[in-house]
């Protein structure tokens, strides 16, 4: 096939645009889960099928988060091997932001579940030859108010960026988060 390669590829971009709204509609409409803002399917190397990120409003109850994690994991048999719940301030396309959320907002004993008896689905040969795989669900959402992000606020950073550019210094490439913001505390 001309469009089947290791992701990102033409086919994975097309699938992502098609699948993400379908997953979102499944969680919101079919399952009636409140607080779901967005569903993102991780593309580079995983090819959309293995890692799913569900973005929630800050005030979403824990019960709704777990309903969505299970719902995303089992909606489509070959998708959702790893499902991560995050809040709106986390960019699901930024692996550093996801790792930060997992490191600071997740307690593995309370916020991680592993589920067995998952089919392997389509993909490259695995390390083991068995028929079964497993699922990993992670709640990396805020469990309460947190201190503000330890960076100057947006007006200060924007002014600093303007001064930087006025001085003719090398072009900046800001990455989120590039300014501090309130996390409720």
What would you call each of these model-derived segments?
Residues 1-185:
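Charged, compositionally biased interaction regions
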């Amino acid at each position: 096939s001309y469009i089947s390669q290791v992701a990102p590829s033409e086919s994975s971009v097309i699938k992502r645009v098609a699948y993400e709204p379908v997953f979102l509609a499944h969680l919101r409409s079919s399952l009636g889960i409140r607080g779901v803002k967005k569903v993102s399917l991780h593309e580079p190397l995983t090819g959309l099928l293995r890692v799913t990120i569900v973005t929630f409003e800050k005030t979403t109850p824990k019960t709704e988060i777990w309903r969505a994690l299970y719902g995303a994991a089992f909606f489509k048999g070959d998708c959702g091997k790893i499902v991560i719940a995050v809040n709106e301030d986390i960019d699901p396309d930024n692996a550093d932001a996801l790792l930060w959320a997992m490191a600071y907002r997740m307690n593995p004993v309370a916020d991680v579940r592993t589920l067995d008896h998952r089919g392997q689905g389509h993909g490259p040969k695995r390390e083991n030859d068995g028929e079964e795989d497993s699922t990993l669900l992670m709640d990396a959402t805020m469990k309460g108010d947190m201190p503000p992000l330890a960076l100057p606020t947006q007006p200060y950073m924007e002014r600093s960026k303007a001064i930087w550019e006025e001085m003719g210094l090398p072009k900046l490439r800001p990455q989120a988060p590039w300014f501090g913001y309130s996390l409720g505390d």
